[in-house]
Amino acid sequence: MEYAAELHRRNNSPLRARPVTRNLGASPRGELAMHAMAVEFPQVHGHPNRLPFEGVLTMVDVASDKAPSGARGHRVVLTRAAAEAALPSLLGMAVDYKAGWDGHDARQKCGIITSAELDGKRLTVAGFVFSRDFPEIEQRLGTDGAMGMSYELAEAHVADMRAQVWTLTQATFTGAAILLRDKAAYRETSFRLRHTPWRERMAVQAAALRRST
């Protein structure tokens, strides 16, 4: 996790954000609570620079396994209410990675988040990595199942700064990092590509070239 001082502002976009809601039967008012949201991109089959991914970004209402970067040595809890309120801020945010896969580098943006969902205690995300621009990512992640994720925040509010475990009651997501799972503050995070791995795709393309010559 990484905390930033500035707040990322959303801009106007022709892309549509699609919320998914469920009815709270226990609520006397029958209120609707958002638990998922997605940005609908036009489908482009075989796009050379869009490689779908999915992952578990963090856990909600659960203390982190270790202190994240910027938390001054404190483990943290992101409340479900805070995560739900901040869900729209994840859409359109970048995913990044750091050489060594052990932290954050917000300047090394390699993909985009297009959907986010609260599934029980898991906050899951999906989107695209820019596989043509960053071929090393597909080569690395297409053959490794040990990857996780870590969120980046701005304007995080802590309920009690004196507490041993900080409870985050409000925040804005500004991005996420792909990193080794054992380097993430939460061990239960995950990251995986949802497409044919790079080596297999290269083999298929090479076979097609041989057939055409």
Residue ranges and their predicted role:
Residues 1-88, 201-211:
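Polar/acidic, low-complexity leader/linker segments enriched in S/T/G and N/D
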